Each structure stands twice: as C-alpha cells, then as structure tokens.
Amino acid sequence: ENAKAHGVTQKEIAAVITHIAFYAGWPKGWAAFNLAKDVWSIDEGDLSYEDEAMRAHTKKMIFPIGEPNDKFAQYFTGKSFLAPVSTSQVGIFNVTFEPGCRNNWHIHHAKSGGGQILICIAGRGYYQEEGKEAVEMKPGDCVNIPAEVKHWHGAAPDEWFSHLAIEVPGEKTSSEWCEIVTDEIYGKLK
C-alpha cells in the first residue's frame, strides 16, 4: 500500500515483482503477486472491456490484458491479447486467450539455449507437446519448454486464460509457426 500511495502504478509493480521473482524464486514472487493484486485492484470504472467474463478475468490478475494480438492473429484460432511486461534482457509477455482460443503448433528453434517458459497467472488453459497428452494449466503452474519441441498452448473451451510467456535466451533463436490445432485435437481436452 505504501508503494501505491507514493505513485507506483499497477504496471510498474508487476514489472518489479516479475524481476524480483527471478532472484527470490517464483513461490515468493507468486505470493507477492497475490498481495499486489489486492492492493492494485482494478475498479469497475477502470475497465473498458465490454465482455463481462473478460472483465471478471481481468480482476484475477495484476498484469494488464494488453492490446488485441493483431501482429500474431494469423497464428491463433480465436482472439488473443498481448501485454509486454519486459522487453530488455529477457522477453516477458502476458498473453491472454479468450475461451476456446489457442495458438498454432509451433517450435522455438535455437542453436543453443532458447525455448520458452509459461507461467499461468489467471484462468485455466492447456499446454501440449506433439505426441503427448495435453497438460492443464491453472494459476501458479509453470511449464518449461525446451528449444526444438513442437507444441501449442491456449485457453480451456469455457474459460479465459492468461500466462506469462518468458523467452529463454539462446543463440540464433527463431520461432516456426506450423499448422492449426484442429477442433478434433482440441476437442479431446479433459
């Protein structure tokens, strides 16, 4: 409350806690997120979202939903939103999926290092590696994705989903977008 009283914004405290979590550990960072979420709660009047479910989802997290993810819309089934959290040193982005939204199968390539880390911050979603069963993600769940692993992630059919996507530094990194996740594959989620 003291930080808020001295002008620290919701976006600034989210960035601070994210950076600290890398040093203090995610369990401590997650506890701080939950405290900050209560202090920096979003007032009903602050929300410009027309969808009531989206408004309710927003209240569950400290990070902003961000803007419509138009740059990558061609790689998603459904609507997603993107909010940069950190773009220096390590790329960290809050990606929010509407119910039923998922990205295409894709691969994070790297000569060495690389890959991606996903941390669910609100809602419920799924992560799936090619050839394996989908893994449900709930707030606080973390998935480490090595480079060269074909995978997808997205929301549950009936719930909004937000995760932090953390770009693992590596040498000669790139992303390859592949085919869509079919309704048949998505329909098998439990």
Regions found by a protein language model. Name each.
Residues L82-A83, Y127, H163:
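Short hydrophobic/aromatic-rich beta-strand segments that constitute the beta-sheet cores
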Residues F93-S112:
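Conserved short histidine dyad/triad with adjacent acidic residue
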Residues E1-A56, K132, K138, K190:
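Hydrophobic alpha-helical segments
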Residues R102, S112-P139, V149:
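A short beta-strand-loop-beta hairpin characteristic of the jelly-roll/cupin
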Residues F97-G100, M137-D158:
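Conserved metal-binding segment of the jelly-roll/cupin
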Residues S88-V90, E98-R102, R124, E171:
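Short, charged/polar surface micro-motifs in flexible loops or helix N-caps
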